[in-house]
């Protein structure tokens, strides 16, 4: 039975032929491509649905090429793929996730997934977090449907080698309630990753952070789309993912502080009150 994947972040020039060639370049054969357009304007909505021969082929393609550079794209882009539910209810089975740190730049979503699924069959996906330029931030997440396998992976793969050129660091990611942006149409079929938070005990320890000072929030991308009188697409993108070790630009911070201080000073100087000679001086009458 045929199965489809959602593909997003498309440029207007990316038509059906472009998408088919891109998959063929990656060694994948697609049955068809449907570009979604606004019915009123005819303008591409920025996403499409790619049909494969069966579910196994679609899943293999998702894990193999998701996050990899998109051939022929200008400006440079990466494959942004997800499951397409087409009216079916999303899979509400429980998810148990791990944070994976110390990833080298060569590790992508497919490599992260393959590293775990070979030993833990309940692994359902891997996500390497990228910055706005498409470069890995050095960490990612994997999710499981079996809590026992998640716990085994945490213990057995802590410090494991074979994924990139550095030993990996693992800690538990605790799920929060998933959030999908609301849309104004009545029918909405969405596939979304849950959001998680965790305290990076092991990851922070390496860099001298106090693991008891707080928690760090992150989320997988979330995709929602509708099939109604119009097609719409809303996404919480990679920019919703935060760096666990943000760099502080001290010079820029001082500059902003001084600018704000100068604005306050100017406001005080522009007011009509004049300083008194002494504490007991009378306040002058208004003119």
Curated annotation (Swiss-Prot):
UniProt keywords, alphabetically: Cytoplasm, Nucleus, Protein biosynthesis, Repeat, RNA-binding
From its record, what is one biological process in GO terms? selenocysteine incorporation
Output the SMART domains linked to this UniProt entry. RRM
Pfam families reported for this sequence = RRM_1, Trnau1ap
Q: What is its main location?
A: nucleus
Tell me where the signal peptide lies.
none
Keyword Flavoprotein on entry: no
Decide whether keyword S-adenosyl-L-methionine is in the record.
no
RRM domain location: 3-86, 96-175
Q: Which InterPro entries match?
A: Nucleotide-bd_a/b_plait_sf, RBD_domain_sf, RRM_dom, SECp43_RRM2, TSAP1, TSAP1_C
Give the superkingdom in one word.
Eukaryota
Q: Which GO terms describe its molecular function?
A: RNA binding; tRNA binding
Q: Which GO terms describe its cellular component?
A: cytoplasm; nucleus
Which locations, inside or outside the cell, does it occupy? Nucleus; Cytoplasm
Q: Which family does it belong to?
A: Belongs to the RRM TRSPAP family.
Free-text function comment from the UniProt entry: Involved in the early steps of selenocysteine biosynthesis and tRNA(Sec) charging to the later steps resulting in the cotranslational incorporation of selenocysteine into selenoproteins. Stabilizes the SECISBP2, EEFSEC and tRNA(Sec) complex. May be involved in the methylation of tRNA(Sec). Enhances efficiency of selenoproteins synthesis.
What do we know about how this protein assembles, alone or with others? Component of the tRNA(Sec) complex composed at least of EEFSEC, SECISBP2, SEPHS1, SEPSECS, TRNAU1AP and tRNA(Sec). Found in a complex with tRNA(Sec). Interacts with SEPSECS. Associates with mRNP and/or polysomes. Found in a complex with EEFSEC, SECISBP2, TRNAU1AP and tRNA(Sec).
**How is this protein named in the record?**
tRNA selenocysteine 1-associated protein 1
């Amino acid at each position: 039975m045929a199965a489809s994947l959602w593909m997003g972040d498309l440029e207007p020039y990316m038509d059906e032929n472009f998408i088919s060639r891109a998959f063929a370049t990656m060694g994948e054969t697609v049955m068809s491509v449907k570009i979604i357009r606004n019915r009123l304007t005819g303008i591409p909505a920025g996403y499409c649905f790619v049909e494969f021969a069966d579910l196994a082929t679609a899943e293999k393609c998702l894990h193999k090429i998701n996050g990899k550079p998109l051939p022929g794209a200008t400006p440079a882009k990466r494959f942004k793929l997800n499951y397409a539910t087409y009216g079916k209810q999303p899979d509400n089975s429980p998810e148990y996730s791990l944070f994976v740190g110390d990833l080298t730049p060569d590790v992508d979503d497919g490599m992260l997934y393959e590293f775990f699924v070979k030993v833990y069959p309940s692994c359902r996906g891997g996500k390497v977090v990228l910055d706005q330029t498409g470069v890995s931030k050095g960490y990612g997440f994997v999710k499981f449907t079996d809590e026992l396998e998640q716990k085994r992976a945490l213990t057995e793969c802590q410090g494991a080698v074979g994924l990139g050129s550095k030993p990996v660091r693992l800690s538990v990611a605790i799920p929060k309630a998933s959030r999908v942006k609301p849309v104004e149409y009545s029918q909405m079929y969405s596939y979304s990753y849950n959001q998680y938070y965790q305290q990076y005990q092991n990851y922070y320890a390496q860099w001298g952070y106090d693991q008891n000072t707080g928690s760090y929030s992150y989320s997988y991308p979330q995709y929602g789309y509708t099939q109604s009188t119009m097609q719409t697409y809303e996404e919480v993108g990679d920019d919703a993912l935060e760096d666990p070790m943000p760099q502080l630009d001290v010079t820029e911070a001082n500059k902003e502080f001084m600018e704000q201080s100068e604005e306050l000073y100017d406001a005080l100087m522009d007011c009509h009150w004049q300083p008194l000679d002494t504490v007991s001086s009378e306040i002058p009458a208004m003119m």
